[in-house]
Every structure is written in C-alpha cells, then in structure tokens.
Amino acid sequence: VFAVVPAENASGVTQRYQPLMDYLSKELGVKVTLRIAADYAAVIEGHRSGNIHIGEHGPSSYVRAWTVTNGGVEPIGTPTDSNGVTGYFSVAYAKASAAGAKLEDFKGKNLCLVDPNSTSGNNVPLFAMNKGGIDPEKFFAKVTNAGSHENAVMAVQQGTCDVAFNWWNSEDDSNLSRMVNKGMVKKEDFKIVFRSERIPGSPYIMISSLPTDLKKAITSALMDMQTRDKSVLDKLTDGKSKGFAAMKHSDYQVTIDLQKFVDDLRKKRGS
C-alpha cells in the first residue's frame, strides 16, 4: 500500500499517482494500491501500524514518522528538479492586489498554514517567523490550518486568508503552477511575500520491516524510473524532474532540528 501526504485533492492525487501504482505493481510483481489520506497524521499512523508500506512525505512528516516508529521507516530518494537539484522552498502567497509586499506588512490579517506536520506549510514558516520576531498568534488576527497546499491557495483566492504558506520549487514548478495547469486559479492573481532558504527534498520512504529483497526492488524501481518508464516520472512531477536522487536519514538533520524547535514552541504555548 502506497500513500502520499495531502497536497492536492483526491482526484488530483489519483490522476498523479495511479500510473506509479501500475508501474510499481509491474516492477515488484505484487499489486500496489493507492491509499488516499485525509491528513498527514493518517499516513504517519499507517506506517506505524504497518498498513502503509511506502509513502511520499515532506521532510517533517518523514521525521515524525521516523520518530513515532522508533526509526522503523527509511528514506529511499527524492525527485530532483529540472536542473537535477534536490530540495525546495516554503513561500507565502498573497493576492496580487493586496497592499503588502512582505510578510511583515500583513499584521492583523488572516494567515493560513497547511498542516501541523507540513514542512513548507507549517514548520519552516513558524521557524522563520520566530526568527523574524513574529509571534503568529499575536501578529495575525487568525491562524488556521487549511489541510492541504491546494486548500491554502484557494483560501487566499476566496479571501478567507490574506496570506498562505505553500511549497515552491521554481516559477514554473510549484503547487500554484500545478493548480494553474489544472485551471483552478490564475497565476497573475497571486504574489509571493516570503521565500525560505532551501529545504531538503521530500522523500519517498518505506517501512524498514519489509523483506530485504522487496526493499531492494522498491529502491531500484524508484531510482531507475527515469530510464525504465519516464512517463510515470513526468506524471508525478509535471515533467519537471530529471529523476530520483538517493537520500539517507542524516540528510534530514536540519529537519530533525526544525521539528524539535516547533515541538518546543508548541509546549511553550501549551497547545
């Protein structure tokens, strides 16, 4: 069973990932099914219970899964961008017509985060705001979790949020560009008012208790996807990836530190 943390709506997830299920089923000789998860926690819990064997995560949800399974999951690799580089960014979107040009200009407005286990939609923003002296609970009128990256953008579009955090690779490779391609929004309606430093790439991971030969087969199926069936990779990444780059747990040390920071922040706030 394969699951992915929610970035887009269920039909979008199915269209993007079903070719991967067919490809993995063929390569592994065993049927791989797609589980649509309601939130990040459902995928993490699925790994812990052993019901979800392979998953695509953001760095923070991988680290959370690694923590709750006592190291019972391992990263395989992450898709590179069109230049063969791994990693991505957290950005904040506002309406193009909004008065502010940077995050600090949106005092007293409504902020949308994505999910408590989202890296670009929660942890990086909280860290960056803290560093910039912003306490979101006091600085903004209201802070809400949109639930997915698409929902966060839609909230800005509909005016329920003035600013929303999201993942972003480049001008033509982001959640926003995917939504534009699907006809959901217009690019010119939005502007970026914050961009983070580069975040480690979102890993595909598997539970460590799988048989060794199966783990090897899963790894080679993903790492060699570019040569074995490029159409699957293109579907996953909107044709914006040069293939997978191998990742190991130590590559996520910065995310582990970030997770600790956010957890400590929550404890301080008593939430």
Q: Which residue stretches match the model-derived regions?
A:
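Extracytoplasmic/secreted proteins, especially bacterial periplasmic and envelope-associated proteins
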Residues: 12-19, 23, 42, 46, ...
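Extracytoplasmic small-molecule ligand-binding "clamshell" domains
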Residues: 1-63
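Pocket-lining segment of extracytoplasmic ligand-binding domains
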Residues: 110-213
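Short helices/loops that flank or line small-molecule/ion binding pockets
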Residues: 41-55, 68-69, 88, 104, ...
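Flexible hinge/capping segments at coil-to-helix
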Residues: 94-115
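A structural signal for short loop-to-beta-strand junctions that line the ligand-binding cleft
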Residues: 72-85, 191-195
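Solvent-exposed coil/turn segments that connect beta secondary-structure elements
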Residues: 7, 57-61, 81, 95-98, ...
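An extracytoplasmic/periplasmic, membrane-proximal ligand-sensing/linker region
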Residues: 1-3, 8-19, 199, 206-271
